[in-house]
């Protein structure tokens, strides 16, 4: 069973990813480093790590969705 993240974590993470395309990837440590620079002194370390974790999952989910859509169209 996975942990359920609060909606504010999801909302913040999705907004950050959508407003900054191409910056984040599937690497949690990289995403955490980028977020620490973006959100400096605005959130706690625990919250920042939760956002970085969801950003990572969100990126993976988007890529998986894009891949399945391409397969359905017969392009892959």
UniProtKB/Swiss-Prot annotation:
Keywords: Ribonucleoprotein, Ribosomal protein. One of its GO terms (biological process) is translation. InterPro entries: Ribosomal_eS17, Ribosomal_eS17_CS, Ribosomal_eS17_sf. One of its GO terms (cellular component) is ribosome. It holds the Pfam family Ribosomal_S17e. GO terms for molecular function: structural constituent of ribosome. NCBIfam families: PRK01151.1. HAMAP family: Ribosomal_eS17. Belongs to the eukaryotic ribosomal protein eS17 family. This is Small ribosomal subunit protein eS17. The gene is rps17e.
């Amino acid at each position: 069973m996975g942990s359920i993240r609060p909606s504010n974590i999801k909302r913040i993470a999705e907004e950050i990813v959508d407003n900054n395309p191409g910056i984040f990837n599937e690497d949690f440590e990289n995403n955490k480093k980028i977020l620490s620079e973006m959100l400096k002194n605005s959130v706690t370390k625990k919250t920042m790590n939760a956002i970085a974790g969801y950003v990572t999952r969100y990126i993976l989910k988007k890529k998986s969705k894009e891949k399945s859509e391409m397969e359905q169209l017969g392009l892959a």
